[in-house]
Curated annotation (Swiss-Prot):
GO CC annotations on file: cytoplasm; nucleus
Residues that, per the record, bind (9Z,12Z)-octadecadienoate: R107, R127
Domain of life: Eukaryota
Subunit: Monomer.
Positions occupied by motif Nuclear localization signal: 22-32
GO biological process: cellular response to linoleic acid; long-chain fatty acid transport
The name this protein goes by in its record: Fatty acid-binding protein, adipocyte
Free-text comment about domains: Forms a beta-barrel structure that accommodates the hydrophobic ligand in its interior.
Subcellular location(s) of the protein: Cytoplasm; Nucleus
Organism this protein belongs to: Pygoscelis papua (Gentoo penguin)
Amino acid sequence: MCDQFVGTWKFLSSENFEDYMKELGVGFATRKMAGVAKPNVTISINGDVITIKTESTFKNTEVSFRLGEEFDETTADDRKTKNVITLDNGILNQVQKWDGKETVIKRKVMDGNLVVECTMNTVTSKRVYERA
């Protein structure tokens, strides 16, 4: 199912993350702090519950969910969001909605790395993590 995602992932690189955060409406100071953070991501599965834990010097977050079921998440920048994550062709697709807005976060394993693509409107950011 999602076994290829399980493990701890160490931040490797980031493209266009500040522009993506700006598109989300994240304030200047928070963008600057988040932009220099190098988070580790740990993904685990217990039965049919998937947990994604993100830890950095900026903020720690943790979310647990079942594929296809809506869940609430308070993001690292304090947005209160409604989310659904599905698995499509080996890609974890997360649709995140709040205040009439929507962003899509796609997680996939490519060449042994975790690649996270975040898109809102026409702005896309790509963050890459390697196995720790």
